[in-house]
Amino acid sequence: MFGLLGCTRYFESDKGPRVVLDKTDFVMGYHEHIGILAAPGSGKTTLTRLLCGLDAPDEGDFIGLRGDALPLGANSFILPGLTGEENARMMASLYGLDGDEFSHFCYQLTQLEQCYTDRVSEYSVTMKTHLAFAINLLLPCRLYIADGKLYTGDNATQLRMQAALACQLQQKGLIVLTHNPRLIKEHCHAFGVLLHGKITMCEDLAQATALFEQYQSNQATIQTEDYSFDI
């Protein structure tokens, strides 16, 4: 099993501790594909870092091992001074993988063509994202975590990435944190909502969407009231 038990995560601010996750529980099997609806600023990135073992909770327990989960959109490991190919081969070497096979997969998936041998510092944001996605797909892990979105690029690129991910997901789990119900409908079979620092699992996507939309409606009402005034 993998997840969090009674985990709290907070950050100090000028007004005191800001609680992002509040004694939340979230436990899943390694082959499950779970979509969690979460509004911007609700703690998606904080949750991702906890589940990937990058941060430790202030309270509670993390279930699993560091390296079990991989943040699918992470690109901080990409070195701008190296070429795309050199970055791919470097990561393959670090994990003891075949450099030729690893690099060939990244070249085919990204379709960077001649840019694959250019320095990453010359890449656009999208090109760098595609390279990172390809590399992440081949790194050893037991499940992927996507914070916000899964793919970028034109339709052809997204179809290639979707097919490559689907192949990996035959043996690996997936957690998608997003505000878009359509995204998790396509890729997940269990659904939840991140509200008020806690994850609430739902019976189906319809229930999760209704709960999420109700929360957004309530937040919009509160913001409107905050800006109301008498004339």
Curated annotation (Swiss-Prot):
<keyword id="KW-0472">Membrane</keyword>
<feature type="binding site">
    <location>
        <begin position="38"/>
        <end position="45"/>
    </location>
    <ligand>
        <name>ATP</name>
    </ligand>
</feature>
<keyword id="KW-1003">Cell membrane</keyword>
<keyword id="KW-0762">Sugar transport</keyword>
<dbReference type="Pfam" id="PF00005">
    <property type="entry name" value="ABC_tran"/>
</dbReference>
<keyword id="KW-0547">Nucleotide-binding</keyword>
<dbReference type="GO" id="GO:0140359">
    <property type="term" value="F:ABC-type transporter activity"/>
</dbReference>
<dbReference type="InterPro" id="IPR027417">
    <property type="entry name" value="P-loop_NTPase"/>
</dbReference>
<dbReference type="InterPro" id="IPR015860">
    <property type="entry name" value="ABC_transpr_TagH-like"/>
</dbReference>
<dbReference type="InterPro" id="IPR050683">
    <property type="entry name" value="Bact_Polysacc_Export_ATP-bd"/>
</dbReference>
<comment type="function">
    <text>May form an ATP-driven Vi polysaccharide export apparatus, in association with the VexA, VexB and VexD proteins.</text>
</comment>
<dbReference type="GO" id="GO:0005886">
    <property type="term" value="C:plasma membrane"/>
</dbReference>
<keyword id="KW-0997">Cell inner membrane</keyword>
<protein>
    <recommendedName>
        <fullName>Vi polysaccharide export ATP-binding protein VexC</fullName>
    </recommendedName>
</protein>
<comment type="similarity">
    <text>Belongs to the ABC transporter superfamily.</text>
</comment>
<keyword id="KW-0813">Transport</keyword>
<keyword id="KW-0067">ATP-binding</keyword>
<keyword id="KW-0625">Polysaccharide transport</keyword>
<dbReference type="GO" id="GO:0016887">
    <property type="term" value="F:ATP hydrolysis activity"/>
</dbReference>
<feature type="domain" description="ABC transporter">
    <location>
        <begin position="5"/>
        <end position="221"/>
    </location>
</feature>
<dbReference type="GO" id="GO:0005524">
    <property type="term" value="F:ATP binding"/>
</dbReference>
<dbReference type="InterPro" id="IPR003439">
    <property type="entry name" value="ABC_transporter-like_ATP-bd"/>
</dbReference>
<dbReference type="GO" id="GO:0015774">
    <property type="term" value="P:polysaccharide transport"/>
</dbReference>
